């Protein structure tokens, strides 16, 4: 006998976030380490929302109560975040590999990454900075990210997204000779 699929979680588009008010939905998503928990709601970033819409975990409505597709959400979000496409591709790849991925904004990175086996860990081990293969990056910019990661005792992972949407990861750090 096939297991009954869980119902999609109702979500609302709210300016630059996606908001969940459904108590069961909040519990299910928070348990899987999605979003930021507030007193009576859970807020999701656009990359989290896109991922959850693509997995059919949430059904997203705008302010006019119109149901939004993945493509419609992507269009809205891309107007706010110019790096949305590459961030989403890296996020999706990391989540599909079983990692817990959280915002890295506080550290000037795209994401904080938690080990797969340590989901309840308080501190992330890695910071992830996402780049497009098609846009040149100055080495001084990468050096700055390495310095920040080192100063907060984290390892820096550079995620490079190519034209096909594939992601390659590089671990960056200091080498003392």
From Swiss-Prot:
SUPFAM superfamilies in alphabetical order: tRNA-intron endonuclease catalytic domain-like, tRNA-intron endonuclease N-terminal domain-like
One Gene Ontology term of the molecular function aspect: nucleic acid binding
Keywords for the protein's UniProt record, in alphabetical order: Lyase, tRNA processing
Record field: catalytic activity: pretRNA = a 3'-half-tRNA molecule with a 5'-OH end + a 5'-half-tRNA molecule with a 2',3'-cyclic phosphate end + an intron with a 2',3'-cyclic phosphate and a 5'-hydroxyl terminus
One GO term (biological process): tRNA splicing, via endonucleolytic cleavage and ligation
Domain of life, source organism: Archaea
Family per record: Belongs to the tRNA-intron endonuclease family. Archaeal short subfamily.
Role, per record: Endonuclease that removes tRNA introns. Cleaves pre-tRNA at the 5'- and 3'-splice sites to release the intron. The products are an intron and two tRNA half-molecules bearing 2',3' cyclic phosphate and 5'-OH termini. Recognizes a pseudosymmetric substrate in which 2 bulged loops of 3 bases are separated by a stem of 4 bp.
Subunit comment: Homotetramer; although the tetramer contains four active sites, only two participate in the cleavage. Therefore, it should be considered as a dimer of dimers.
UniProt protein name: tRNA-splicing endonuclease
């Amino acid at each position: 006998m096939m297991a009954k699929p869980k119902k999609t979680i109702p979500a609302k588009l709210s300016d630059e976030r996606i908001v969940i008010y459904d108590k069961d939905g909040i519990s299910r998503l928070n348990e899987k380490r999605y979003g930021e928990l507030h007193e009576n709601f859970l807020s999701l970033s656009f990359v989290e929302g896109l991922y959850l819409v693509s997995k059919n975990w949430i059904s997203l409505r705008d302010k006019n109560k119109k149901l939004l597709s993945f493509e419609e959400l992507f269009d809205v979000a891309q107007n706010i975040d110019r790096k949305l496409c590459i961030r989403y591709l890296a996020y999706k790849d990391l989540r599909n590999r079983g990692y817990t991925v959280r915002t890295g904004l506080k550290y000037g990175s795209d994401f904080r990454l938690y080990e797969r086996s340590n989901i309840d860990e308080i501190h992330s081990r890695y910071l992830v900075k996402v780049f497009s293969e098609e846009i040149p990056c100055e080495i001084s910019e990468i050096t700055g990210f390495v310095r920040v990661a080192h100063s907060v005792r984290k390892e820096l992972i550079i995620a490079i997204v190519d034209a096909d949407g594939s992601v390659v990861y590089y671990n960056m750090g200091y080498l003392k000779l």
